[in-house]
Amino acid sequence: MSQSVKRTAADKPLAPCPICGKPARTETKPFCSPRCADIDLGRWLGERYVIPGPEEEEMSYPPRSDDENRSR
């Protein structure tokens, strides 16, 4: 008789790091290291990654009440 081995989520291999392609680590998931996580954060902060949306000119915002009070 063969024994069945139950696999848990911890046994499942993680996807590769999106920055360098090395195996990701649980501690820094989805990255392989804090360095790769920092590189990714820097790309977001440097606006190399963007989420598509309407241009700022196309967006309309209602006037804020504190803006109205300042013009008086």
UniProtKB/Swiss-Prot annotation:
Binds 1 zinc ion. Pfam families: YacG. Zn(2+) binds at C17, C20, C32, C36. One of its GO terms (molecular function) is zinc ion binding. Residues 51-72 are annotated as: Disordered. InterPro entries: DNA_gyrase_inhibitor_YacG, Znf_NHR/GATA. Keywords: Metal-binding, Zinc. One of its GO terms (biological process) is regulation of DNA-templated transcription. HAMAP family: DNA_gyrase_inhibitor_YacG (MF_00649). Inhibits all the catalytic activities of DNA gyrase by preventing its interaction with DNA. Acts by binding directly to the C-terminal domain of GyrB, which probably disrupts DNA binding by the gyrase. Interacts with GyrB. Belongs to the DNA gyrase inhibitor YacG family. This is DNA gyrase inhibitor YacG. It comes from Methylorubrum extorquens (strain PA1).
